[in-house]
Amino acid sequence: MITKSNLKNTLKSAGFSDTSKDKYEKNYPLSDCSIIVDFKNEKIIYPEDKGFKVNVATTTNFSEPENFVVLECVNRLLDKGYRPENIELERTWTLGHEQKSGRADICVSNQNGKMLFIIECKTFGVEYNKEMKNILSDGGQLISYWQQERGCRWLVLYASNINSSNDIEYTTDSIDCSDDENILNLARKDATILLYKDAHTASELYDAWKETYEQRFSGDIIFRDDSIAYDIGVKPLRKKDLKDFSENDKIVNRFEEILRHNNVSDKENAFNRLIAL
């Protein structure tokens, strides 16, 4: 976990320099901005003069270890080429019938101001795993935010850590918020298929993700080496990314139903027939 006690080592590993007494700074040439971390006043100074938006000041202090994860993630975004005017911390929405407030850690928009992805930051290990379980159970915080920002393209869960060698490590996963074109085609023949575009509540979005997309994750689509800022997406599959289908996968059952419905019994030609359908 990144804490106050190891924050200086984390900043050094991230490319920050000790510019003066108890201040660390990093400049980002791609966007002509900088971040300053003031240890004396326990303050993280983001480039608000360059359009970076901070909605809640508590995310810029040293009070919670999660703030350091947000800092490390923002550093990674700026290194990747995202511009400060497209990054926003702690965007707030009113969620659900109880009018509870929900705040997204990091929102990133495209050059036209449309929401590109929402990042929920957690401390490494227990809290990250806990939120992943929440997402699998009921959609967690991220799908609630998605309901408020239906134009969002991706949902991202993120955590980072500094290890015993003072190397920064991170873990992340993502959900594609777009209906798959193949699924849309199947839905034209099967009205029971749940689609994101037809969902009106967070629970309906979760149901579509669970039932139709089988709680599919897309991995590290933001920070992996071949990902380009503002042009993210699922890259060509690499061998290490492949996962075997199991007989219990619902998508396999769905294919079998379509084959039976169309009287396709020739297993040798089933794939070609399925594509043709």
Regions found by a protein language model. Name each.
Residues N55-E90:
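Short, well-structured hydrophobic secondary-structure segments
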Residues A276-L277:
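Long recognition/docking surfaces used for binding and targeting
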Residues D18-I36, T58-F62, E85-G113:
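Active-site metal-binding core of divalent-cation-utilizing nuclease and nuclease-like domains
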Residues C73, A104-N110, M115-Y128, Y145:
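Conserved catalytic cores of phosphodiester-cleaving nucleases, focusing on short active-site segments
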Residues M1-E64:
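Interdomain/boundary linker segments immediately adjacent to catalytic/signaling cores
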Residues E88, K130-L194:
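Nucleic-acid nuclease catalytic cores
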Residues E85, E98-S101, M115-I118, V126-G139:
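Active-site-adjacent loop/helix micro-motif of nuclease/hydrolase catalytic cores
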Residues M1-F16, I183-K243:
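Non-catalytic C-terminal interaction segments of nucleic acid-processing enzymes
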